[in-house]
């Protein structure tokens, strides 16, 4: 079972919040107190909340659910992409385009355009174009890849989103709320925990802390996927035995 310990969190700096003057009073239940002008997050709250979130991610993945990892702030981009790919899930790590979930029909058309351009770049179509036109299409493809590359194979809305930085990704959270998609989010002391189904109180800026969250989430998803595979294999064996 994917779990994270208090020691893991301390070493990653999960407990360091923001300067006290930037706090959001709604985070008071999760704050231990101030130290040198910085709020310290109460890890005795965070540890069980995070491990509960991981257990739910495992359950969703075991039912063939799709998880969308979201982290577009600079400190999160690489870790979010690597974790999503590691557990064969989906990600947005560049910029959240308004309507990415709530206007999925339009997003799907953009994904189709991206896939068409990818095909053209590989089947020799680009070679038949003028240099200028080939360059225009290449740039369009690169731009679409940056925004949609992590969701181009998602084939429909996700069953949950795992967010690094509730404050930074408030648009993604609002869209998920509108559609009833469960939200798992790391919430720092300056953020609003409202609208988040699984709150993970913690530092959302430190690279090591972000690495800890997404690595654990990916492990939880992989565990769920392996449970699903085992269940399917057992069912196949039972059918064959009848």
Swiss-Prot record:
UniProt keywords, alphabetically: Ribonucleoprotein, Ribosomal protein
PROSITE patterns in the record: RIBOSOMAL_S2_1 (PS00962), RIBOSOMAL_S2_2 (PS00963)
UniProt key word Lipid biosynthesis: no
InterPro entries xrefs: Ribosomal_uS2, Ribosomal_uS2_bac/mit/plastid, Ribosomal_uS2_CS, Ribosomal_uS2_flav_dom_sf
Annotated Gene Ontology cellular component terms: cytosolic small ribosomal subunit
The UniProt record lists the keyword Ribonucleoprotein: yes
MF GO annotations: structural constituent of ribosome
Gene Ontology BP annotations: translation
UniProt similarity note: Belongs to the universal ribosomal protein uS2 family.
PANTHER family tied to this protein: 30S RIBOSOMAL PROTEIN S2 PROKARYOTIC AND ORGANELLAR (PTHR12534), SMALL RIBOSOMAL SUBUNIT PROTEIN US2M (PTHR12534:SF0)
Identification of the protein by name: Small ribosomal subunit protein uS2
Gene that this polypeptide is encoded by: rpsB
């Amino acid at each position: 079972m994917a779990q994270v310990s208090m020691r893991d969190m301390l070493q990653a700096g999960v407990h360091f919040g923001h300067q006290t003057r930037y706090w959001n009073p709604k985070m008071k239940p999760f704050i231990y107190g101030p130290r040198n002008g910085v709020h310290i997050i109460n890890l005795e709250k965070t540890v069980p909340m995070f491990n509960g979130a991981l257990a739910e991610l495992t359950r969703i993945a075991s039912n063939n659910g799709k998880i969308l990892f979201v982290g577009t702030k600079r400190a999160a981009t690489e870790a979010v992409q690597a974790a999503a790919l590691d557990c064969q899930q989906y990600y947005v790590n560049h910029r959240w385009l308004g309507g990415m979930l709530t206007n999925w029909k339009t997003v799907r058309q953009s994904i189709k355009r991206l896939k068409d351009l990818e095909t053209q770049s590989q089947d020799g179509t680009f070679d038949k174009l003028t240099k200028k036109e080939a360059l225009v299409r290449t740039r369009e493809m690169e731009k679409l890849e940056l925004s949609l590359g992590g969701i181009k194979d998602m084939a429909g809305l996700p069953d949950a989103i795992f967010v690094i930085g509730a404050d930074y990704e408030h648009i993604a959270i609002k869209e998920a709320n509108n559609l009833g998609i469960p939200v798992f989010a790391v919430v720092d002391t300056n953020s609003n925990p409202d609208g988040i189904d699984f709150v993970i109180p913690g530092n959302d800026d430190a690279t090591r802390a972000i690495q800890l969250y997404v690595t654990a989430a990916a492990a939880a998803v992989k565990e769920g996927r392996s449970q699903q595979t085992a269940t399917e294999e057992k069912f196949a064996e039972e059918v064959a035995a009848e």
